[in-house]
Design a protein with these regions (language model features):
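A common structural junction motif
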Residues: 77-80
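GIY-YIG nuclease catalytic motif and its immediate N-terminal context
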Residues: 1-45, 49-61, 66-73, 86, ...
């Protein structure tokens, strides 16, 4: 029997009001709510913790981890302006989506 899996790629930032000075961190996880909570607690990646990347700006769901990892790699190769454009198209107000994700834990 096939088992459904859940994987997410996500972008977190340290600011949601100043795109110019914000840091963007891209990651992949199999439990988005747990990972966002870890970022907020400072136990996420060293880079994200150092720059206080706690605000979730964007995420995508995948069933296959290989697809999620490939997409993560693709986004990491994008220019900063292209990443910002992706966020602006789907989250133009740069609202922190983490509260919604954590609420649905």
């Amino acid at each position: 029997m096939a088992r459904d899996y859940n994987f997410w790629i996500y972008i977190v930032t340290n600011r949601n009001h100043s795109v110019l000075y914000s840091v963007l961190y891209i990651g992949v996880t199999n439990r988005l709510s747990r990972r966002i909570w870890e970022h907020r607690e400072g136990s996420g990646s060293g880079f994200a913790a150092d720059y206080r990347c706690t605000k979730l700006m964007y995420y995508e769901w995948y069933r296959d981890v290989r697809d999620a990892i490939a997409r993560e790699g693709q986004l990491k190769k994008w220019s900063r302006s292209k990443k910002i454009g992706l966020i602006n198209r789907l989250n133009p107000s740069w609202r922190d989506l983490g509260a919604d994700v954590l609420q649905n834990r």
